[in-house]
Amino acid sequence: MFETLKALNPDPILGLLAAYRQDPNPRKVDLGVGVYKDEAGHTPILECVKQADLAHRAEETTKTYVGPAGDADFDNGIEALIFGADHGARRDQRLRTLQAPGGCGALRIAAELLNRAKAGAAIWVSDPTWANHVPLLGDAGLEIKIYPYYDGASQSLKADAMFAALEQIPAGDLVLLHGCCHNPCGVDLAPADWDRVAEIAVRRGFTPFVDLAYLGLGVGLDEDAYGVRRLASAVPELLVASSCSKNFGVYRERVGALSLLCATPAQADVVFGQAQNVARGVYSMPPNYGAALVGRILRDPAATKAWEGELGAMRDRINGLRSQLSGKF
């Protein structure tokens, strides 16, 4: 059986990391895998995560399954963090959120769900986009299409070309948008751009799908969530795949979520059930430990404040290093 399989080329991201490790140049800079490092080149565990870990270990009484939707405290906490606790979509009970194994798990569950809803649906991704978007979405059966986004020569957004492309996308298609900290180009939509995207989406009838992997690491939590919140206030349907790997530093715990906005609460219940059914057939139950820690932090105001302080320190360091690096060229 296995003799039919062919050797694959190295993953473009992981292959770059391997090349970096083999390069003897002492002045090399690692711009590969998106992992935060401190001044010593170490990826630390946040103090708030350590404290949540201690409390969780002291109180945990079982290792039984949590169900396909995952940890309820985490689901509620991450939804409130992304959309805002008092967002109209939450008040109207049109939002549902389920835990997933990282942002990748959320993307794949969304893709499988969308293909179940409309087989072979077209999803438009930015040029460029994160390398793993194409296999995660395309291998689930979605048709990948591309819209212009970044001008490498001017290092700026191709705003006119992007909006012109969005104006041609038909109803029933999906548009993948980077919520903040666009990977790989780093050029984000301004609030006015998000306003225009929302207006076009409503008028044209396409469904926005936001990948939110870096919430809080761009400008700030509320600023980085502007696009998602603006879309959720305008469109009848929206998908958001989020990750806690970067902003909580829980990379190996695989903590992510898929949030689904639907036109009515009844439709939201149906879609939520379908999403859990998809998850049941892919990985059955999500891992609980990391999500339990994040959920604990988000339900405790003091712990949340401590996390926001640590997140701000990471954000300031990242932005400072980016500024220093750009000054070298």
Which positions does each model-derived feature cover?
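Hydrophobic/aromatic beta-strand patches that form the interior of the parallel beta-sheet core
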Residues: 29, 124, 145, 209, ...
